[in-house]
Amino acid sequence: MDYIETAILNCYGIREAEQNMVFAARLTQHGHTIQNMADLMDLYRQSYSQKTVENIAGLPHPTVQKFMVITVAVVGASRRFLAQITRHQNEVKYMSASLQYSNYSGHAAFAIPYGIMKADKEIQDIYKKSCQSDLDHYAELCALGIDHDSAGYATPQGLRNVLIISATPYQWKHMISQRTCRRNTDETRIVMLQIWQRLYKLSPILFAPDLTGPFCQRGSCMEKQMSCQNPISKLWIPSDILKADYPLLIRREVSSHKD
């Protein structure tokens, strides 16, 4: 799953999410001191420490983490990833590039699954030939006057896409926890680990492993007999997981930076 890029479109949202979370928590205990809007704004502007963020984020009261949304862009992930990630609907909004309104003739590209990337060249060629054939047939259908929506059914699941995801901090943590588990598909794990890595860089406390990672990092596996029996270290941050589980991607990233 190379050439997948992620970016947080409103980095300021992380800071606002922390501030709103602390403010909402404080409000529950200071209602008797607020007589007017000026009092409320004084409470809103009160400073706070990272320890305060840590304490509140660890409480079983998710509502305080729902007063801000963080918007993330994903470029290059497949439409199969789109089908999987959009199962999450609570407090999440999506906007995707459209097969109906976009003409991919001559512009389409397809993602290469990590399992194919690791395989012999012969296997890689079989996969690439199959995807390219689908894209060629799509372009041929469009050239014959078939509308883009109908022709889109001929495209492969691996067709690269552009996706915007907007969610509350609490829901981001829920999605990351669910989708970075080693029982998920490689592409979904890679994308969500990349997103987590960016969120963690901006707020290592709010998105700490013990608050954001899969079940095995936050306690113990809850999959029972479906467990992978290969728990992730509780000390690992997202970059550590990427290095351990997807070393080929890391090597390619390092190589591209050198070039």
Language-model regions: role of each:
Residues 1-259:
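Family-specific signature for flavin-dependent thymidylate synthase
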